[in-house]
Amino acid sequence: MKLLEKITSYEFICKMVDIYNKFVNFVAILMIPILMLTLLIAIAIIFYDLRLFVDYFLHGAVAEEYDKAFKLLVRNILNFFVLIELFKVFIDVLEFRRIRKRQIIEAGIVFVVREIILIVFEHRFTFWDLLGFGALLLALGLTYVLLEKSYMEYLKFEHREITKRERSERESLKEQRKGELKR
């Protein structure tokens, strides 16, 4: 029973949260250079593909080789945009210690648009592919709009005048939470 009291004490919980925060900061310190290196490598790949494309163009390469180089360049540029969106999500996780739904949806939209561009560009699509991607894009877009609308409503609600009753309820809830943490 003494162990249970110790691990549920306020001091122990604060210590554990502090250890967790230090661990997350350590991981962030390790991950940020890796993220930067990944972006630099992606940029280098794009420049290499661009050089390859220009080389094929200037030396009058076979149309098939020229087409492959161009498709590879487009694919890697679109991959770079997806990487940027995913890195924005990761940086937000490090900065705010939470995943923002809005940014996940933005990354999903960028990924779906990338896939649509690639299948249309490579002429390997069917009616059902486009219908499926269209439905997915519509769902992601509606979710994004609804999230934005609900956030605006939340802001309006937060900045309104608080009644005396609401203020006293908030104060009593704060006191109740403090009491629970002390136990």
Swiss-Prot record:
Bilayer topology annotation: Multi-pass membrane protein
Coiled coil: none
InterPro entries xrefs: P_starv_induced_PsiE-like
GO cellular component, one term: plasma membrane
Transmembrane segments: 26-48, 72-91, 104-121, 125-147
Chief place of localization: membrane
Compartment(s): Cell membrane
Keywords noted in UniProt: Cell membrane, Membrane, Transmembrane, Transmembrane helix
Signal peptide range: none
The name this protein goes by in its record: Uncharacterized protein aq_2087
Native species: Aquifex aeolicus (strain VF5)
